[in-house]
């Protein structure tokens, strides 16, 4: 409890910002869903043949996994708040649509006939009789949708939309339960609060409900429109993948750019995995992010490294990006954050493990825990199978940070890692030598669209100040400061740049 209170004290400003973002996303999504589902539900009560097929389509949409839906939306609308809202609206449609249709359909036919006998036309019957009587059922659907939206909105953090999911993802990444709770508890309380408010609205008069919904529509429009008029034309956005290391790097980029130019830099840490961030760059939703040479070849260019020489691998990656994607890849830093296989110290000692080839005789004892990306890469597990002839029958896939918890608890004894991971030292893991030279060099460098550099040519000089800087050991220590000692990535980045004389 004390740790949670301490975390709250340190991060209360971040919590407030995330809470406001979460409410904005949830509020906008709910009202757009109501604007779509309520009229559609009314329409279906008058066209009953279409009702079941359309409601079934809404049900099918709700079964699409949220991560898959976000992944499909990114190439179409980019990253940020727009795809998050679209996804949340899709998930919220079913309960509102079904309850609107059911609520109106179950109004006592005798009352409808009585209103017809009094000379009311179909619109008056709807407004004066059917909707007021159906409103409790409709509001129950809206309440269900609201709770669903607030819970699912935590995933918006994966695509840079912000919200309480930022704190939850950061907690998972840092293995910090207090951070996870700092995001999860407000999300739960928010769901309870909104449910209470909507329950109160459910008991209000029909006229009051309509006025409230109308006010909500105007507020929604304001939330969507105002930020566009307030945007800063001289602002650039630098994003990073999940993890402490990308967050340190993007803060370095921010600091060197703002030190030498008049550009304002907005950073978006922990945006998501490789495909999310790269697609965001392609669509122009972000301007720069740090990418690694080996990832460029394997994931984007679908090429094997022609050599293991770092300079030649960088040149191959740089030229391929320029040709295939019209992107500029600036000079890389010194450290090589390549893949590695690491085992628990006990397993290494028991079996005298020094290099990857040593796993052959004990492969039946291996309990491997790999990331999904590593398992699917030709320079990952597929390469291990091809080049080393190793297949692990007991293999689980999991999120990057969960692997270290799993090896600590003994659930696994082998994992994939990056050579600069602070956890290698934290958990005293044994890194196995890549004796067959499977893993290519992975040097990080700023990646951007060529048109971005054409627009802001002043970016090149400050960013190239990081070229050839940061050794493996320095990066590992910086990661340790963030992941283990709890320092902010911004502070660690600033301290390094000042120590090196790169900024004043």
Curated annotation (Swiss-Prot):
Spans through the membrane: 25-44, 57-74, 81-97, 146-170, 179-198, 210-229
GO biological process: glycine betaine transport; SOS response
Alphabetized GO MF terms: amino acid binding; transmembrane transporter activity
Gene deletion effect: Deletion in strain LO28 significantly increases sensitivity to physiological concentrations of human bile, in vitro. Accumulation of abnormally high levels of bile salts, such as chenodeoxycholic acid (CDC), in the cytoplasm, when strain LO28 is cultured in the presence of bile. Attenuates systemic infection following oral inoculation of BALB/c strain mice with bacterial strain LO28. No obvious growth defect in strain LO28 in culture when exposed to osmotic or chill stress.
Protein's cellular compartments: Membrane
Residue segments, region Ergothioneine binding domain: 231-504
SUPFAM superfamilies: MetI-like, Periplasmic binding protein-like II
Any one GO cellular component localisation term in the record: ATP-binding cassette (ABC) transporter complex
Alphabetical list of PROSITE patterns matching this protein: ABC_TM1
Domain ABC transmembrane type-1, first and last residues per copy: 19-198
InterPro entries per record: ABC_Gly_betaine_transp_sub-bd (IPR007210), ABC_transp_perm/SBD (IPR051204), MetI-like (IPR000515), MetI-like_sf (IPR035906)
Keywords noted in UniProt: Membrane, Stress response, Transmembrane, Transmembrane helix, Transport, Virulence
Regulation: induction: Up-regulated by salt and chill (temperature of 10 degrees Celsius) stresses.
Source domain of life: Bacteria
Free-text note regarding domains: The transmembrane domain (TMD) and the solute-binding domain (SBD) are fused. SBD binds to ergothioneine.
Family: In the N-terminal section; belongs to the binding-protein-dependent transport system permease family. In the C-terminal section; belongs to the OsmX family.
Subunit note: The complex is probably composed of at least an ATP-binding protein (EgtUA) and a transmembrane protein (EgtUBC).
Function recorded in the entry: Part of an ABC transporter complex EgtU required for the uptake of ergothioneine (EGT), a natural low-molecular weight (LMW) thiol antioxidant. Responsible for the translocation of the substrate across the membrane. Also contains a C-terminal periplasmic solute-binding domain (SBD) which binds to EGT with sub-micromolar affinity. Does not bind glycine betaine, carnitine, choline, proline, or cholate. Plays a role in bile acid tolerance. Dispensable for choline uptake. Probably not involved in betaine, carnitine or choline mediated osmo- or chill tolerance.
Protein name as annotated: Probable ergothioneine transporter EgtUBC
């Amino acid at each position: 409890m004390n740790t949670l209170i301490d975390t709250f004290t340190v991060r209360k400003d971040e919590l407030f910002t995330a809470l406001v973002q979460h409410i904005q996303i949830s509020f906008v999504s709910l009202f757009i869903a109501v604007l779509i589902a309520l009229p559609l539900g009314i329409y279906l009560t008058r066209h009953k043949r279409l009702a079941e097929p359309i409601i079934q389509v809404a049900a099918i949409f709700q079964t699409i996994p949220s991560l898959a839906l976000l992944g499909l939306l990114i190439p179409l609308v980019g990253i940020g708040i727009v795809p998050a809202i679209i996804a949340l609206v899709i998930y919220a449609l079913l309960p509102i649509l079904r309850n609107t249709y059911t609520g109106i359909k179950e109004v006592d036919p005798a009352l409808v006939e009585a209103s017809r006998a009094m000379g009311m036309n179909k619109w008056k019957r709807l407004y004066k009789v059917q909707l007021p009587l159906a409103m409790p059922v409709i509001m129950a659907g809206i309440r269900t949708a609201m709770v669903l939206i607030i819970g699912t909105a935590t995933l918006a953090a994966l695509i840079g939309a912000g919200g309480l999911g930022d704190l939850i993802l950061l907690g998972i990444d840092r293995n910090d339960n207090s951070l996870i709770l700092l995001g999860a508890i407000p999300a739960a309380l928010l769901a309870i609060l909104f449910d209470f408010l909507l329950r109160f609205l459910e008991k209000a008069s029909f006229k009051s409900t309509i006025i409230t919904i109308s006010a909500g529509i105007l507020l929604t429009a304001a939330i969507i429109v105002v930020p566009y008029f307030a945007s800063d034309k001289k602002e650039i956005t630098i994003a990073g993948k999940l993890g402490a290391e990308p967050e340190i790097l993007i803060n370095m980029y921010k600091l060197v750019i703002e030190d030498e130019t008049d550009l304002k830099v907005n950073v978006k840490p922990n945006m998501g995995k490789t495909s999310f961030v790269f697609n965001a760059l392609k669509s122009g939703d972000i301007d720069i992010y740090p990418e690694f040479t080996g990832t460029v070849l394997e994931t984007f260019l679908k090429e094997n490294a022609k050599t293991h020489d770092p300079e030649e691998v960088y040149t191959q990656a740089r030229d391929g990006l320029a040709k295939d994607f019209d992107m500029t890849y600036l000079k890389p830093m010194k450290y090589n954050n390549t893949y590695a296989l690491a085992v628990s110290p006990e397993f290494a000692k028991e079996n005298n493990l020094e290099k990857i080839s040593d796993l052959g005789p004990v492969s039946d004892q291996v309990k491997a825990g790999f990331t999904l990306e590593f398992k699917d890469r030709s320079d990952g597990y597929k390469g291990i199978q091809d080049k080393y002839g190793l297949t692990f029958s007991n293999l689980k896939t999991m999120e990057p940070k969960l692997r270290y918890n799993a090896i600590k608890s003994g659930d696994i004894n082998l994992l994939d890692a990056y050579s600069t991971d602070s956890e290698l030292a934290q958990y005293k893991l044994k890194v196995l030598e890549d004796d067959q030279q499977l893993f290519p060099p992975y040097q990080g460098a700023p990646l951007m669209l060529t048109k971005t550099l054409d627009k802001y040519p002043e970016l090149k000089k400050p960013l190239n100040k990081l070229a050839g800087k940061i050794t493996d050991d320095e990066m590992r220590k910086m990661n340790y400061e963030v992941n283990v000692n709890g320092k902010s990535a911004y502070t660690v980045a600033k301290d390094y740049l000042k120590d090196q004389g790169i900024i004043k």
